[in-house]
Amino acid sequence: MNKEILAVVEAVSNEKSLPREKIFEALEIALATATKKKYEQEIDVRVSINRKTGNFSTFRRWMVVDIVVHPTKEITLEAACFEGEQVKINDYVEDKIESVNFDRITTQTAKQVIVQKVREAERAMLVDQFRKHIGQIITGIVKKISRDNLTLDLGNNAEALILREGMLPRENFRPGDRIRGILYGVYPEARGAQLFLSRSKTEMLIELFRIEVPEIGEEVIEIKAAARDPGSRAKIAVKTNDKRIDPIGACVGMRGARVQAVSSELCGERIDIILWDDNPAQFVINAMAPADVVSIIVDEDHHTMDIAVDSSNLAQAIGRNGQNVRLASQISGWELNVMTTEDLRSKHKEEAYAAFNIFKKNLNVSEKVIKTLVKEGFSSLEELAYIPLNELLEINNLTEREVQLVREGAKNGLLLLELDQKNQIKNKKIEQALLNVNGMNELLALKLAEKNIFTVEELANQGIDDLIDIENLNSEQAGLLIMAARNICWFSSKV
């Protein structure tokens, strides 16, 4: 039997390309499992196989614990020490017992356990092999097609899944087709396929350019950002520190060969290659291509930009179903508002008029000073109250006394506004817990109250579309606010 064990280990190790130690461990677990089945009680068993001779010994063991819950598998520290053992908590006390004989049932049990453990070892080895390839493009053969996913054969007994959302909208595959995808997930705990590929992720686009454009692989050209509407359109931003190289031309290739190769792999996805710029406004202008931007106004406080285009160019700037401006927003990370030059002029005229009235109400200065402040781009009391004093003093035609009056008036106006807000909150009976929601302030609470939202629970029941029309609240902020309320209301024991 000893030689048979060594022969089994050698054979399985060679057949499965697994280390001999993994097979020995599987055998030990298999023999321990077979031994346990010989006892009516639930016991803990350990088997040790000599790696050189194949001899094996069997031990029944008890874990040392403070309080015994399972008497057949546990022993107290006092009892273990009484028997002369030098142990501590979580150690094991062992007694050698008779090893199991290999009858039909024992052999069948051992075989089942060995098969299971070998599969687990193969799965672990597969995970180790592919984990270092996460973020790279993998090629596979379509093995099976189901409603929700594709199963790919990667070779060497490795399989991968492409989920439905990881495919492009118009893609149709047949068994035997060779396809490529970006490896994004390796999950050792999963049953069956543990490798997940995607063709819709932005990283797929980036890696395809890295393959097709040698200058990117050599890091002469850098991909700074990318955004995709998978299978339809994409934008990718590139830059280079080598002034001799045209990064856009290098990515397009001779007669468009390089970008066409990427586009063909992605079902004809149209790709705009744009030049990266460290200046956010200039980068957004580049990202809006092929539309021509007439003017752009940046609101850093709200991380938004107002973009003006000619009325004849508005449809192109927005794109079909808002695609062009949406991709430009994704690749830049800014919220973009596209409008005609006439609409932008009208909007800023309204904003200037509103700012003029606020300043006139709160600042004890002449209309000439107020017009100067509005012309300089100031639109709120907060800006005037907290802007560095030296910046106010640098404004032409303003005296030190006028600057002092502006600063005092702005701060007093904010205090009165805060007091008014507190009174309104009290009168509207806004719940105090609503004011404690992460991201909430008194002004926002009042705007919610105008929508009959007075409590955390009422906020938690809202959708982003319900709040998106609130001034100075974008969709991301609205989503975070709602989730903060839901965390308090739905997932906390107290509100």
From Swiss-Prot:
Q: Which domain of life is it from?
A: Bacteria
Pfam families in the cross-refs: HHH_5, KH_5, NusA_N
Sequence ranges assigned to domain S1 motif in this UniProt record = 135-200
Q: Name one GO biological process term.
A: DNA-templated transcription termination
Q: Cite the repeat ranges for sequence.
A: 364-414, 439-489
| Alphabetical list of InterPro entries matching this protein | DNA_repair_Rad51/TF_NusA_a-hlx, KH_dom, KH_dom-like_a/b, KH_dom_NusA-like, KH_sf_prok-type, NA-bd_OB-fold, NusA_bac, NusA_N_sf
Q: Does the keyword Protease apply?
A: no
- GO MF annotation: an example: DNA-binding transcription factor activity
Q: Which CDD domains match?
A: KH-II_NusA_rpt1, KH-II_NusA_rpt2, S1_NusA
KH domain: residues covered: 302-370
Gene Ontology cellular component terms for the protein in this record: cytosol
Q: Where in the cell is it found?
A: Cytoplasm
Task: From the UniProt entry, list the residue stretches annotated as the region 2 X 51 AA approximate repeats.
Answer: 364-489
Report the PROSITE patterns cross-referenced here: KH_TYPE_1, S1
Give the main location.
cytoplasm
Q: SMART domains per the record?
A: KH, S1
**Positions of transmembrane segments:** none
Q: Which UniProt keywords apply?
A: Cytoplasm, Repeat, RNA-binding, Transcription, Transcription antitermination, Transcription regulation, Transcription termination
Family listed: Belongs to the NusA family.
Q: Which NCBIfam families match?
A: NusA (TIGR01953), nusA_Cterm_rpt (TIGR01954)
Free-text function comment from the UniProt entry: Participates in both transcription termination and antitermination.
- List the HAMAP family hit by this protein, alphabetically: NusA_B (MF_00945_B)
Q: How does it assemble?
A: Monomer. Binds directly to the core enzyme of the DNA-dependent RNA polymerase and to nascent RNA.
Q: What is this protein called?
A: Transcription termination/antitermination protein NusA
Q: Which organism is it from?
A: Buchnera aphidicola subsp. Schizaphis graminum (strain Sg)
